Amino acid sequence: MFCWLSRLCGELSTPTRRTTQLIWSSAARSMVLSSQRIPELSSFVARTNTCGELRSSHLGQEVTLCGWIQFRRQNIFLVLRDFHGLVQVVIPQDESAASVKKILCEAPMESVVQVSGTVISRPPGQKNPKMPTGEIEIKVKTAKLLNSCKKLPFEIKDFMKKTETLRLQYRYLDLRSVQMQYNLRLRSQMVMKMREYLCNLHGFVDVETPTLFKRTPGGAKEFVIPSREPGKFYSLPQSPQQFKQLLMVGGLDRYFQVARCYRDEGSRPDRQPEFTQIDIEMSFVDQTGVQSLIEGLLQYSWPSDKDPLVVPFPSMPFAEALASYGTDKPDTRFGMKIVDISDMFRNTEVGFLQDALSKPQGTVKAICIRKGAKYLKRKDIESIRKFAADHFNEEVLPIFLKTNENWNSPVAKFIMEEQGLGLVKLLETQEEDVVLLTAGEHKKACSLMGKLRLECADLLEARGVVLRDPALFSFLWVVDFPLFLPKEENPQELESAHHPFTAPHPSDIHLLYTEPHKVRSQHYDLVLNGNEIGGGSIRIHNSELQHCVLDTVLKEDVKLLSHLLQALDYGAPPHGGIALGLDRLMCLVTGAPSIRDVIAFPKSFRGHDLMSNAPDSIPPEELKPYHIQVSWPMDAETEKSSSNHPCRSES
């Protein structure tokens, strides 16, 4: 391809040549999955072959291809594209083929055509080893315009920048890009391998659970669906949690589902109102069994073009994750761990450190940024300090190490020589390192330092320091979570850390009735590169224990879950499971910047479908059967005026 371009158009500018090369390199990337494809790609359709499958072994064969016109040069060559790749087509120049030439030369880019012709070898010196079909081209005999393309809102090329709004508005065009094709086809293949692993190798049953359900207490907000019964509503389930537990009561033993789930969480850029999870439940299983299953599942379905996964994945208690990384989903690809240096400052004269250590759970935390003085500017440090003040109402002190004995910091004069040497040893500091130090209540201080750890990693990587290898997939199990957490609005009351069906740790059941805030759960999260991609637990299978958790601890209305409590009374087996977030997993596997890039038709970050303009209004006559009347919000002044109107009637 590059050779004939050079032969035909040596006058091309450098940017144009680079653009052409990018087209082909993108196409080559789409071939990564070719070896995994089943044959018979052209069965039942009008073509004999796909554009990307032809090789020198097909020389002399008569073929029929269907695809989109991606590139044309001087009305002599064009590039035809389909889902499988690209192929070069030679446009006939003789008079007898004038009609064929007219079709192929006049059809706009991205028009759909069908061509028939002979597979021939490219002339010597014009073969392209970087392209799977680079040894051959198609000498066209007949052509048919299947559909012409109007002027496009954007070019169908991955390297052409498009706003996300435009991409979502014309999603059907965006799906033609090499990257979107790769993402969705890889997603399909991984799901297929997961089904094979679960059903064929381990006897799981694929069961579809209802989408229309009833509102359940706790957890995320649910979408409400009206019914034709006055005042009664369905809700869309945020997960099949209750149904899969009921399937265990029903003796299904091993269940899985590629489940659609729904959460009404408003405008969140990293979430979708509807999403997909690989939902799994097993009877007679413990935590180790579920974790081993998932490790095998991911290992079996992992893309062949990536390094194989090493199992078992490491495990880390929640308390350690918080203390060392400041989060329950640590990115373990790089260090910069949080270190507790409270003992170094028990007798300090620094005011805010003294205040923090005098309070319950008061602590002093630090992180060491290797060569931070070399890469971070003063404005970066000030930005970090401002972030801490604005979001955590905490102070952060920087310490610059010119040498191990020379500290440049506002607190340097308060650090005795013995303390300084102790800090150097504890933090393993070196010349040009920067230490960030804060103090406060343990959880809050850890959370702040966890945020600053990631912020500093972003700053260092922006300066060219590689900390988080994008090709490295660092899986981690986080375990031993608390079963309950204080409510934000009322810390005296408790809520489930995950959901109310999670079983307490066997060693802590006795605390459930006296000190429930100390009870650990049998919950486990699967973390990948600092992102939670799965969560599960061993469930409560005893009706009395479940009733106690709901009624006594959480103060929930048990009537809403009477069906589940009743089912647990009829010989429910011990059971547990997990759900893997398929969208998030695929986002990380493909390296996509957003989960919207691995979903065929996603919503915007505000939850809108920009292609169809959903959600949309419904005429009042269509709402009437559902006994719904829309009341439009009014500003305070309008509402006051309306309430004082003399004609307003009370009802």
UniProtKB/Swiss-Prot annotation:
PTM sites of type N6-acetyllysine: K379
Binding site for L-aspartate: R263, R539
Positions where Phosphothreonine occurs in the chain: T216
The organelle targeting sequence, given as a residue range: 1-44
A single Gene Ontology CC term: mitochondrial matrix
Aspartate, as annotated region: 241-244
Binding site residues for ATP: R263, D264, E265, E532, G581, L582, D583, R584
Pfam family, one: tRNA_anti-codon
Top EC class for this record: ligase
Keywords: Acetylation, Aminoacyl-tRNA synthetase, ATP-binding, Ligase, Membrane, Mitochondrion, Nucleotide-binding, Phosphoprotein, Protein biosynthesis, Transit peptide
Top-level taxon: Eukaryota
Residue numbers carrying Phosphoserine: S239
Example of a GO biological process term: aspartyl-tRNA aminoacylation
SUPFAM superfamilies from the UniProt entry: Class II aaRS and biotin synthetases, GAD domain-like, Nucleic acid-binding proteins
PROSITE patterns hit by this protein: AA_TRNA_LIGASE_II
GO MF annotation, one: nucleic acid binding
EC identifiers of the protein: 6.1.1.12
Classification via Gene3D superfamilies: Bira Bifunctional Protein, Domain 2, GAD-like domain, Nucleic acid-binding proteins
Cellular localization per UniProt: Mitochondrion matrix; Mitochondrion membrane
Reactions accelerated catalytically: tRNA(Asp) + L-aspartate + ATP = L-aspartyl-tRNA(Asp) + AMP + diphosphate
General function of this protein: Catalyzes the attachment of aspartate to tRNA(Asp) in a two-step reaction: aspartate is first activated by ATP to form Asp-AMP and then transferred to the acceptor end of tRNA(Asp).
Family stated for the protein in its record: Belongs to the class-II aminoacyl-tRNA synthetase family. Type 1 subfamily.
Listed PANTHER family: ASPARTATE--TRNA LIGASE, MITOCHONDRIAL, ASPARTYL/LYSYL-TRNA SYNTHETASE
Quaternary data: Homodimer.
Name of the protein in its database record: Aspartate--tRNA ligase, mitochondrial
Organism whose genome encodes this protein: Bos taurus (Bovine)
Highest classification ranks of the organism: Eukaryota, Metazoa, Chordata, Craniata, Vertebrata
Gene: DARS2
